[in-house]
Amino acid sequence: MNAADYLKKLAVIPVYKDTGNLVKVLTKFRDKIVDEICIVVDCATKDDLYEMRKAAAKIGTPVHIISNRDRKGVGYAIREGIEYGLGKGHKVAVVMAGNNKDDPREIPRLLTPILNEGYDYVQGSRFLPGGKREKNPFLRGVFSRLFPFFWTLSTKVRCTDVTNGFRAYKLKIFSDKRINIWQSWLDSYQLEYYIHYKVFTLGFKMKEVPVSKIYPYRHKGGYSEISPLRDWWKIVGPLVYLKLGVRN
């Protein structure tokens, strides 16, 4: 076994109120895919937390639950997961949806380039050969296709999927003083695109790998309620701000 396989690996799953889909996600985790799972849930009831803990007790991977009484935002939730991972000595984090759009059985696709090939950041892409997408909402599908084109133009780094939240990275990137994820303007969807831009432009070794993105016909919770029409600036803003030097 490669020595890199012993790097502690954490799965971070941000969730908004949802329990039913999260339970489905947890059942797909296989032993030793990651060392620990950190669920960060906003606005969960006592019953929600009970169901999460009951589902967590049935799998072989340790699960830590962080519960926020108020809705903090997906960026805030991911940051809490990152902070937890850093505090527990994890070296790699996998971030994924808690609403059953991402398949934990595909986590090795994201981890292999980091563990065996020296990559710092691996982005899952539904558009690469071998990737899969089903039931994508029309507007979101169009936006997801077009947005990487503008990222490629702006960063000079070719990419095929930017809005897919299924990705993995070495936690050491956050020790770089040029990356400051602890800014309040990153509490919502902005954080993911902030990290993406920094990795693209600061010389970290990154690649894309094919993954699946399967949308349910109706989806609630799990921080999947993003709308390109309503939330477009939270998605586009980090690229504009950082490119123009307005934000750090």
Positions of predicted regions on the chain:
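Hydrophobic helical membrane-anchoring modules
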Residues: 1-8, 20, 27-28, 180-248
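A short helix-to-beta-strand connector/capping loop
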Residues: 7, 59-63
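Active-site beta-to-alpha loop of glycosyltransferases that engages the nucleotide-sugar donor
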Residues: 13-27, 43
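Short, acidic, metal-binding catalytic loop of nucleotide-sugar glycosyltransferases
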Residues: 27-36
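Short, high-confidence coil segments that cap the C-terminus of an alpha-helix
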Residues: 34, 90, 118-119, 204
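A conserved acidic beta->alpha catalytic loop
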Residues: 41-52
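Acceptor/aglycone-binding surface of glycosyltransferases and processive sugar-polymer synthases
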Residues: 70-72, 76-87, 104-189, 216-226, ...
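Short beta-strand-to-loop acidic/aromatic patch adjacent to the donor-nucleotide binding site
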Residues: 90-101
